[in-house]
């Protein structure tokens, strides 16, 4: 007891007697006092974890402390099993490269009209640059003079691949973006060679689903006046984070830098209300997406449960032979196939599952679901290009970009 009292007196005297104390010293002394002097026992691990977590949260919405169990949990990968989805073990499906097992990044590449190519890029993955180059080569063979790149649902990916693909459209030695932070060296990412499509009209489609590396790519083409940007403002995700592991399996994920466009705009959307800085990528031509179907509760329910995909796949499998005989080409299918009868099967399945719907629901989403079913059957018969050719009938940004491409 006497020793404890002496320790308390010594610590109090030391703290009071220090003319200056650094924040780090204050933090260490506070931790020492709580662990060693508090009246009740303290679980050191829980106490430290709790306060580290709160410290990280106070920095920004993205810096965080990862407890050991959280740090071990990686992102779900294609091919991972999902236990007990509707009573059965499911496996994530995605078209992958047979050699690398990496997901394909180009969803579709086709001629949108006689001279305009269209490429839908879902992510900036390991194979994305090679896929884009191959798509450009094939489209050029088909007479492509201008190109539209669709990034509306591109969530980003590897920034070095964004630079590599931008290099196909920009002249040599141009800044694509800059990474800058107070405690890390500034790094400027530049083009380094002659690209495949440095001339010819270029449009990039963006929206709220355009994030991170996709925003950097679009901003570079915009800032260098290389592409016309069409759609809605991008998401605004432009932070660089590092993960610092601890020996116990926990880790800190901390923001260390920000990405800036060639004209110096920070991509990151402000997360402090009073900040009024510019952010993201603003389109040159603002075009709102077609989202009316999403306001239908019934549509959201059947989409979540996968009713359209199930019905369309079953129909395509059961009628594949007769469909291929009737529609001998992809073009013939797109022009003449009517999916209204399949829509009636969706309604019947919905009723069987007890999903309620109103006339208002139908008014909001019927036309979209009918088109979606046609696209899904088309994908089964002719592949992804057919799916996108059908669904892009409702792609407002694409329609505007095509109109802009033809303007003198």
Labelled PLM ranges:
Residues 21, 28-111, 390-402, 408:
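Extended, small/polar residue-biased N-terminal targeting/export presequences
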